[in-house]
A protein has these predicted regions:
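Short alpha-helical scaffolding segments that buttress acidic/His motifs in well-ordered protein cores
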Residues: 91, 95, 108-115, 160, ...
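Amphipathic alpha-helical segments used for helix-helix packing
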Residues: 86-88, 99-128, 172-173
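An amphipathic alpha-helix adjacent to DNA-recognition modules
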Residues: 8-13, 47-70, 74-77, 81, ...
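C-terminal peripheral helix-coil segments that are non-catalytic and often amphipathic
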Residues: 98, 128-204
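Short, amphipathic alpha-helical "lid/cap" segments that border enzyme active or binding sites
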Residues: 12, 66, 85-92, 157, ...
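Helix-turn-helix
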Residues: 10, 18-52, 56
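Hydrophobic alpha-helical connector segments
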Residues: 71-105
Length: 204
């Protein structure tokens, strides 16, 4: 990694930690430059503005996450033998992998901040850049659940997404036991969540 790319990555990592801790409004550029060990000119050079920096923090994680989701969905989409659990696995497993991958857990706190702070510009950014992912999953859910109205399906998908976000946060009642590996615990979480979500989506 060259010096410029290394500086940009360092700024993104510091910003992610600060946004998780202080929120988007609470984290100042002065705090960011101190945490990243750079000057303000470097932040402006790589990102131009704080808003652009916030967006790049999201893109760094979500571009990869959603590429994995869509690749998994492509493997099962439209096939007559595809089950609801197959589509849910494509949606859930990459997200759980992210939450346990390096700084992914920290990013989940940033994502939670985004929803909690009701930032309209950030919501628009997420919708504009990643809304197509949810639309593709929703279309496949609708194919498998033709008995549901569009409104009812949206309600259920929204609640499934909430359950996934909770599972990714790591703050649930079920914590990993000391004799269970991280990989095994993640697989247990995925299996339980997929079964739970499938039951909720397909309920009468």
């Amino acid at each position: 990694m060259n010096s410029s790319a290394s500086t940009k990555e360092r700024i993104l990592t510091a910003a992610e930690a600060l946004f998780a801790q202080r929120g988007f409004e609470g984290a100042s550029l002065r705090q960011l430059t101190a945490a990243a060990g750079v000057n303000l000119a470097a932040v402006n050079y790589h990102f131009g503005s704080k808003d652009n920096l916030v967006e790049e923090v999201f893109k760094r994680r979500l571009d990869q996450l959603n590429a994995r989701r869509l690749a998994a969905l492509k493997q099962v989409s439209g096939q007559p033998e595809t089950t609801l659990e197959d589509v849910l696995a494509a949606f859930i497993r990459p997200a759980l992998d992210l939450s346990h991958d390096g700084g992914g857990g920290l990013f989940m706190r940033v994502l939670a901040r985004a929803f909690a702070e009701h930032d309209d510009s950030l919501r628009k950014f997420l919708s504009d850049n990643y809304g197509h992912v949810m639309r593709q999953f929703t279309a496949e859910f609708a194919r498998l659940l033709p008995q549901l109205t569009k409104e009812e399906l949206y309600w259920r998908i929204d609640l499934v997404t909430g359950a996934l976000t909770h599972a990714m946060s790591g703050f649930g009642m079920i914590q990993r036991k000391s004799d269970v590996s991280e990989v095994t615990h993640r697989e247990q979480t995925a299996a339980h969540l997929i079964r739970f979500a499938a039951a909720g989506l397909s309920a009468p």
